[in-house]
Amino acid sequence: DPKGKTDAEVMRFCQSFMTELQKYIGPSLDVPAGDIGVGGREIGYLYGQYKRLNQFDAGVLTGKPLGFGGSLIRPEATGYGLVYYTEEMLKANGNSFAGKKVVISGSGNVAQYALQKATELGATVISVSDSNGYVIDENGIDFDLLTDVKEKRRARLTEYAAEKPTATYYEGSVWTYAGNYDIALPCATPVSYTHLTLPTKRIV
């Protein structure tokens, strides 16, 4: 669990882990990828240790930063894809994101880029969440502030709310929010909504 750990602590853990893992991975064996809690920073540390130990790096990890041969817009791909897919469903019904109010769960990679793309398409995203609670901002979540808080400072959403005068932080699940919105985009795990928690909402 990387919460509360320094970059140096995370790096040492990743290096120790790769020292053992490197015996079992490779282009013709297994190619690990990032997942929840394992982003570009962690993949970079793992990649560096593998290369140091083997003097070879081709095809051994996916999700590397661009500087290490990673793919362009890989970090954005899932969040963008969710919004593009949803936009096509809306178009098929004569609708679009434009003018819609959107609730997003999560505040990690997928949530951040779903927020960015939905906003670009004309929606107002009013929420993001983490494991402790959620933020509601009827004026729209600030993408730049969110990424600064979550990616650079690696802080909680309480810090976001403290810096955004129009934002309010609530404890609990975002799916208990009783306000009005048009589209729900679940971008966190576990998915904590059901037909009981959202009886009157349109889930796309």
What label would you give each PLM region?
Residues 76, 80-169:
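Glycine-rich phosphate/diphosphate-binding loop of Rossmann-like nucleotide-binding domains
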Residues 194-200:
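Conserved small/polar residues in nucleotide/adenosyl-binding loops
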Residues 161-193:
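Accessory "access/gating" subregions that flank catalytic or transport cores
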Residues 1-97:
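Glycine/serine-rich phosphate-binding loop and adjoining beta1-alpha1 elements at the start
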Residues 19, 28-31, 58-59, 65, ...:
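Structural motif
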Residues 38, 89, 109-110, 133, ...:
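Short, glycine-/Ser/Thr-/acidic-enriched flexible segments
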Residues 3, 7, 36, 72-76, ...:
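Hydrophobic alpha-helical scaffolding
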